[in-house]
Amino acid sequence: MMSVRAINGCSIIRTATSAGGPPVSLFRHRIQRLRASHLREFSKLRLNFPLIRADRRFLGNSDAPSCSTCIHSLVESVSEELESISRRKGSRMRVRASVKVKLTSYGEVLEDKLVNQELEAGLLLEFKKDADRVLLAVLHRRDGKKNWMVFDQNGVSCSIKPQQITYIVPNVYNFDHTGLTDFLQRAQDNLDPQLLEFAWMELLEKNKPVTPEELAEMIYGRADPLESYCAHFLLSQDEIYFSILESKGSRSIYSPRPTEQVEELLRRQRVKEAEDKEFQEFIQLLKSAKKAPSHAKPPKSSWLADDKVQDRIGSLEAYAIDAWASTDQQKLAGTILKSMGLQKTSVSALNLLIDIGYFPVHVNLELLKLNLPTHHSEAITEAAEALLSESSDIDAVRRIDLTHLKVYAIDVDEADELDDALSATRLQDGRIKIWIHVADPARYVTPGSKVDREARRRGTSVFLPTATYPMFPEKLAMEGMSLRQGENCNAVSVSVVLRSDGCITEYSVDNSIIRPTYMLTYESASELLHLNLEEEAELKLLSEAAFIRSQWRREQGAVDTTTLETRIKVVNPEDPEPLINLYVENQADLAMRLVFEMMILCGEVVATFGSQHNIPLPYRGQPQSNIDVSAFAHLPEGPVRSSSIVKVMRAAEMNFRCPVRHGVLGIPGYVQFTSPIRRYMDLTAHYQIKAFLRGGDNFPFSAGELEGIAASVNMQSKVVRKLSNTGLRYWVIEFLRRQEKGKKYTALVLRFVKDRIASLLLVEVGFQATAWVSEGKQVGDEIEVRVEEAHPRDDLILFKEVI
């Protein structure tokens, strides 16, 4: 037998010349480096163990050669011997994992080695503090029948259970707990993971198990308390070379793993080390991006260029909106947050993504949570473009030419696509004839087509302060479907003749061609009406018709619900401080009332037309509340009265076979028809009406099919409506946050919620909020308030009355 011994800090390995040892290449490769992964495992003890230094001398023998010299000599000797064995044998022999079988001949010895020491005060031991930590401690006194009080290495006194004890350091009695720090320091100086590898090679050849004390004798030359503990620590933290063969209480016996298993574990370790290195590089990238000024942060695209980086960022994104796809994704995000020194919360993930520049400061979290489509796929876009270039107008021969009419399209100034426009003339008998021209998307799209299915899936266009996500691909909507000023446009025109009292006397629905004359905003239309220009007599006629229609509806029991409405447009929303344009629209404004009345008139005519011809349509109705609205007559007309009335209104109802009275609007039936580019249910009404106009009753949808479509679309519309309201509220709060501190706002008291807490309407902002108001204030009173706190991300705004 060849025997080489290095004492205290180097190693002792007895290598037999018998066959069956590990391959020479494995030994040569392993002997030359210390594995960083093992040192990371030792960090669980909260220690940083240094590598064995080359200039270190053996304790107790100052004339002995250095550790590095011994190891070098050991490498040469053992390598030469193993090469000689390899040549003689001609091939490597495998070591069979039959340790347990061979142990049966000395089972009694095994049992003896597993005998646990009696617990008593003064013993030095290791115990498991939690899932990630083991600590050294000294037994102090009993705590109840089974537990013990200990002083741990951090100077903390605590109670432990016997099951927590992982090792009792042998031959140590009455240990002074103040010496724990010194013991740990000496253990730190004595640990060398490479020694474990040498021992594995010798024990594998002998197919022999080992206890910590026996390993200490092998690698340190003695089994004193310090060396025994170091050997235990090396074995207990090792995941490569040894596995537990038997265990009882705090005693364990270890067995060397087979060569093939060790090689596989080492391979996995190398993979893990590479992954850990890559992960740490990613963490460093996050830290660098976080520290960088806003103008120097990496663009969002840079985080998506690499698949692994994209996956990690994706896990944080999912964590931020509480929508992880798997527990693995959740754990990955948690690991990233922990590595960044952050709490494992959705808020931490969100703030991190904002800090690195991946998310803008004002990212719309609700939009991300809902996962609504914000772009059309390439397939849908291509299909839409094909419709523009290839589709023919099957209604061309049936279209009436209305290009001679003056046509007004009135909408908000940032409207992308225009669904409707208006015309009017006075007949010779004095009656007013009105045309409501509606865009004709069914000229291009047919039920069940690819583009139609996508529109149905979306249900509606999404209008947010920061962006618009159209139901149809933009090019098709803008260039094909939308009404465009000065161009011939396909439309479905609803014409109505009104009596002087506002009642409908004649009506028709036709496919048409129109040429829009004016594209007006509500503000410009109102200005033209106030100017009362002779050359805009048609606009004046429309306003007159709107007035008499409003009067007629009131006589039929209609309820006025006009109020103030906020509209916000954010310019450059990706900027940390984007420009916020806020508009307050009064629904009682002349132009807004005009458009509102004409849309209701169109809906009534379509419902009547559908009823007359038995056309299945999405008829909408709303039963009036059984509360007499005259009970609110004492309240100021406008937002205050409307707010109280709306509170008692019942929900809308739908019927798909015949009209339902719409009590709030004061009309016998109603069908939403004027926004087919923006709302899918309006489009279904177009499909049905146009099928009838083509000369038959072969409708695309039965009443039952319409009901099914409506259920799905209405659900989607509710989601979009909530998203729009949430986005609007966020930006109103952000707008108010930026205003001068202490600025006063006029507010109307709408109602009292509880005691003196009132629901308010801020007149200058068109925003509803709650605040405590002073004694004596009544519903309808005007008060002044100021903003106390405004946090849009937390959906928090607090107002205080200025007294």
Swiss-Prot record:
GO terms for molecular function: 3'-5'-RNA exonuclease activity; exoribonuclease II activity; RNA binding. Disruption phenotype: Shorter 3' nucleotide extensions of mitochondrial mRNAs and reduced accumulation of several chloroplast rRNA species. Germinates only on sucrose-containing media, with white cotyledons and pale green rosette leaves. It catalyses: Exonucleolytic cleavage in the 3'- to 5'-direction to yield nucleoside 5'-phosphates. Residues 399-694 form the RNB domain. Expressed in seedlings, roots, leaves and flowers. It holds the Pfam family wH_RNase_II. One of its GO terms (cellular component) is plasma membrane. Transmembrane segments: none annotated. Belongs to the RNR ribonuclease family. PANTHER family: RIBONUCLEASE, RIBONUCLEASE II, CHLOROPLASTIC_MITOCHONDRIAL. 3'-5' exoribonuclease that catalyzes 3' maturation of chloroplast and mitochondrion ribosomal RNAs; degrades short nucleotidic extensions to generate the mature 3'-ends. Involved in the maturation of 23S, 16S and 5S rRNAs. This is Ribonuclease II, chloroplastic/mitochondrial. It comes from Arabidopsis thaliana (Mouse-ear cress). The gene is RNR1.
